[in-house]
């Protein structure tokens, strides 16, 4: 989604891993 794209661009590769963990914990993935 745009979140991964924006976060990946602004924060770097680690942001994508953080988003994955976030969605995984909340069951949104």
From Swiss-Prot:
Contracts smooth muscle of the gastrointestinal and genitourinary tract, regulates growth hormone release, modulates insulin release, and may be involved in the control of adrenal secretion. Signal peptide: none annotated. Pfam families: Galanin. Its main location: secreted. The keyword Transcription regulation does not apply. The keyword Secreted applies. GO terms for cellular component: extracellular space; secretory granule. It is found in: Secreted. This is Galanin. One of its GO terms (biological process) is neuropeptide signaling pathway. Keywords: Amidation, Hormone, Neuropeptide, Secreted. Disulfide bonds: none annotated. The gene is GAL. It comes from Ovis aries. GO terms for molecular function: galanin receptor binding; neuropeptide hormone activity. Belongs to the galanin family. The modification Alanine amide is found at residue 29.
